[in-house]
């Protein structure tokens, strides 16, 4: 399998960092997946989404989650996020402690060039 960078220099990551009600962790994940995999998720319809998001659970604190994805345009992400928050209001949000589901954004300033990853992959063979 070829090595690929997690994200590309010049793009952005959205990083949601939040806690879920400890009594509803499984419910949260189920509802998140139902919304995320549905045709009703406008994030997946945007050409500004470069790589689809991943939902990660903290191994030390099972109530803590991160949602991370790569986008080329953070204004476009913020515009769609506002639609989610104000119009669609997905059911999984009710299990987030404090109800805050707003990301921080990070600019990707370094990403290993593909030719170096290809060389590293060849060396593993």
What is the predicted role of each segment?
Residues 17, 107-108:
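Short amphipathic
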Residues 1-2, 51-54:
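Short structured motifs
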Residues 34-51, 60, 70-106:
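An amphipathic, aromatic/His-enriched active-site/gating alpha helix that lines ligand/cofactor pockets
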Residues 61-65:
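A short, glycine/Asx- and small/polar-enriched loop/turn
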Residues 21-23, 72-74, 110:
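Short coil/turn motifs at secondary-structure junctions
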Residues 11-19, 66:
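Active-site-flanking beta-strand signature of metal-NTP-handling nucleotidyl enzymes
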Residues 19-32:
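Short, surface-exposed ligand-recognition loops at beta-strand->loop->(often short) alpha-helix junctions
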């Amino acid at each position: 399998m070829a090595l690929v960078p997690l994200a590309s220099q010049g793009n952005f990551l959205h990083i949601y960092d939040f806690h879920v009600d400890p009594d509803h962790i499984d419910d949260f994940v189920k509802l998140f997946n139902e919304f995320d995999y549905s045709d009703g998720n406008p994030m997946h319809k945007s050409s500004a989404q470069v790589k689809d998001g991943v939902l990660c659970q903290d191994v030390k604190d099972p109530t803590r989650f991160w949602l991370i994805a790569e986008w080329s345009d953070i204004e476009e992400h913020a515009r769609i996020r506002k639609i989610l928050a104000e119009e669609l209001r997905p059911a999984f949000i009710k299990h987030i402690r404090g109800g805050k589901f707003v990301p921080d954004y990070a600019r990707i300033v370094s990403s290993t060039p593909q030719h170096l990853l290809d060389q590293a992959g060849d060396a593993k063979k």
